[in-house]
């Protein structure tokens, strides 16, 4: 079951992944997201 908050976060993540508009265009957020995405890649073996 997905809450509205989780869906909103997912939409933002999709926007970041696709390189589209983002609600958090700050360098800090991009750095955090990059680190998070890298950790996902290593964990899931992408």
UniProtKB/Swiss-Prot annotation:
Q: Which domain of life is it from?
A: Bacteria
Propeptide segment residues: 1-20
Q: Give GO terms for biological process.
A: defense response to bacterium; killing of cells of another organism
Give a yes or no for keyword Secreted in this entry. yes
Q: Where in the cell is it found?
A: Secreted
Q: Which UniProt keywords apply?
A: Antibiotic, Antimicrobial, Bacteriocin, Plasmid, Secreted
Its chief place of residence is secreted
GO cellular component terms, A-Z: extracellular region
Q: Does the keyword RNA-binding apply?
A: no
Please give the function described in this protein's UniProt entry. Has a bactericidal effect on sensitive cells but not a bacteriolytic effect.
Q: What is this protein called?
A: Bacteriocin acidocin 8912
Gene symbol?
A: acdT
